[in-house]
Amino acid sequence: MPNTDVSSLSMLGQQTETAQSPEEAVLEKVPSNHAGTDYVVRFTAPEFTSLCPMTGQPDFAHIVIDYIPGEWLVESKSLKLFLHSFRNHGAFHEDCSIYIAKRIVELLDPRWLRIGAYWYPRGGIPIDVFWQTGKPPEGVWLPEQGVATYRGRG
């Protein structure tokens, strides 16, 4: 029988304010009903925003997070609010990208995780950041992230 106990969740089904910083943001988890089965969960945030730590100008990215759960799944509303907490946060692209991945790994201890952060150009240069916890388990269907390389007018 599926584990549907959501009593520990504080945000799902509630009106929730966005944290003022990623450090303050709460990520929540729910039990996986399929622990022991290798499958990929994908979250896509095509309109992620943060601020340049030097100029305060907005930075935009298309972020794709893939993970193979262990015992836990990330609760999606808490992830959405966590990502939104970067909106007024000043950090370099690389720091935002790796921080997101490491917070999820710390919360879930997944079998495997990768992040692809495709940042839109600032100063004429797009920056893409890729990180993963190691090799994925064999035999898992792992789709391409499907985000085209930035081409401008090329």
Swiss-Prot record:
The organism's place on the tree of life at top rank: Bacteria
Residues at the active site: C52 (thioimide intermediate), D59 (proton donor)
Chain sites annotated for binding substrate: V74, E75, S76, H93, E94
Gene Ontology terms, MF aspect: preQ1 synthase activity
GO biological process terms held by the UniProt record: queuosine biosynthetic process; tRNA modification
Reactions listed under catalytic activity: 7-aminomethyl-7-carbaguanine + 2 NADP(+) = 7-cyano-7-deazaguanine + 2 NADPH + 3 H(+)
Pfam family, one: QueF
GO cellular component: cytoplasm
InterPro entries per UniProt: GTP-CH-I_C/QueF (IPR043133), NADPH_dep_7-cyano-7-deazaG_red (IPR050084), QueF (IPR029500), QueF_type1 (IPR016856)
Region called Disordered, residue ranges: 1-28
Coiled coil: none
Keyword terms, alphabetized: Cytoplasm, NADP, Oxidoreductase, Queuosine biosynthesis
Cytoplasm among keywords: yes
Protein family (similarity comment): Belongs to the GTP cyclohydrolase I family. QueF type 1 subfamily.
Known function: Catalyzes the NADPH-dependent reduction of 7-cyano-7-deazaguanine (preQ0) to 7-aminomethyl-7-deazaguanine (preQ1).
NCBIfam families: QueF-II
Record-given protein name: NADPH-dependent 7-cyano-7-deazaguanine reductase
Lineage: Bacteria, Pseudomonadati, Pseudomonadota, Alphaproteobacteria, Hyphomicrobiales
